[in-house]
Amino acid sequence: MVEIEELRRLPSPGPKPQAIAFDGERLWIGSRETSRMYAIDPQSWNAHDEGVAPGVPWGATVVGDELRVILGEGEEDIRVIRRFVPGHGFKTDGAIVAPDNGTGSHLSFDGDRLYISQWYNKRILSLDEKGNVGSIIALPHEIAGHTIVDGKFYCITTDDENTHEYFLTRVDARSGGAPKIDDIARLHFDARGLAFDGERFWTNHREAHETVAFARPDA
């Protein structure tokens, strides 16, 4: 299995970066330590603080002109998916409690349905606008981030979060049958979250307070 080709490694705008998404122009990063959202120009790396979240931002994805951010709220860290409007912040309407009593950590959107991944349950679930679960895709590894590229899921995965062995796993579930799952590259750091800007992937090396861009290995 090939190693990822790192293209850039940059200081994150906030400590312990966790959530990450790309809206076509800007990267969006959520800090687990400060619970703040940041918008970043990926070329200049200039960042703008977009304000505090009503919880810990674990994962994010772009839905039209908005974001959906999954937050850990309250002492029990219940996961709630909330609307985030750039320039206006988080909205109270349209909130969805994550499935299985508030379980999940990362999000993606295929233009029609929202998807949520569950780390320890090793699966990706599709959700409708009310949070009802549709399809369920089981993976062989724990999931530390995912995004959708060309109709396929690309996931950051691991078999043991206490090691530094992580994988980029490609999941093609479009046939309607058993998904085709391939580990296509290896990462030697504790990656969190995954986004794609049309050319390269972005993830967070959370404990190093860095954001990393790497080449798409199957391009």
Task: Give the positions of each predicted feature.
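Short loop/turn segments that connect beta-strands within beta-propeller blades
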Residues: 41-45, 84-89, 127-132, 172-176, ...
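Short loop/turn segments that connect beta-strands within the blades of beta-propeller domains
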Residues: 23-24, 33, 63, 77, ...
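A short beta-strand motif characteristic of beta-propeller blades
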Residues: 5-11, 45-51, 90-98, 132-137, ...
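Structural motif
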Residues: 36-39, 76-82, 123-125, 163-169, ...
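Conserved beta-strand positions in repeat-built beta-propeller and related beta-rich domains
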Residues: 29-34, 69-77, 116-121, 155-163, ...
